[in-house]
Amino acid sequence: IYVRPTNDELNYCGDFRELGQPDKKCRCDGKPCTVGRCKFARGDNDDKCISA
């Protein structure tokens, strides 16, 4: 069941710096999110990075 992320969750990926990732960026679809933030939340496998 897909639960619509809250605004906090949407912003989480852009604000969070994940240890071990290049430049400590959050991952989207397994790749570091270096621009903007994750579209969905928290590096889900089907996530994409978006500019925001």
UniProtKB/Swiss-Prot annotation:
Its main location: secreted. One of its GO terms (cellular component) is extracellular region. It comes from the Eukaryota. It holds the Pfam family Ornatin. It is found in: Secreted. A motif (Cell attachment site) lies at residues 42-44. InterPro entries: Ornatin. Keywords: Cell adhesion, Secreted. GO terms for biological process: cell adhesion; regulation of blood coagulation. Potent inhibitor of fibrinogen interaction with platelet receptors expressed on glycoprotein IIb-IIIa complex. May prevent blood from clotting during either feeding and/or storage of ingested blood. Belongs to the ornatin family. This is Ornatin-B. It comes from Placobdella ornata (Turtle leech).
